[in-house]
Amino acid sequence: KGSMLTKMPGDLWQKFANLRLLYAYMWAHPGKKLLFMGQEWAPWREWGEGRELDWWLLQHAPHKGMQGLVRELNRLHRSLPALHARDCEPEGFRWIDADDAERSVFSWLRFRAKDDAPVAVATNFTPVARPGYRIGLPKAGRWQVLLDTSATRYGGSGPDTPATVTAESRPLH
């Protein structure tokens, strides 16, 4: 038992970073999404029927940032059919790299239809920044960065990721 935040390992900064990562991972992975009774702003206490939610936590930047992240995850989920249209079909998901255990970075693609542009997801499960980390995107050119859980607006330490990245036309994975 306990709130999602208290289940996260590490110090205060790591707890919030890990929870942001968990929520982004959950929203980007196939399957239906569920948060319960205030978990979108990372309360310290678990919900209880005998008291109100800890709304006052939204006065504090880390909790307000978490709420903003969940708002953005919901917006992306609604606006990008690749993130929800084929939740129950294997064709809606393809790993780019599930084997980088040394750096704890995993990447995958989500698809709405075979010929549609996919949504690429890269997750870093460590507190170590990975500048210049390369993943094998399926098409060369500019890709828009839609979300970075370490962005300062979500309570992360930044630096904020550039708005676009460029994929080169050379095999990687």
Where in this protein do the model-derived segments appear?
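Active-site clefts of carbohydrate-active enzymes
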Residues: K1-D11
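Carbohydrate-interacting/catalytic domains
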Residues: D11-R20, Y25-L35, Q39-H173
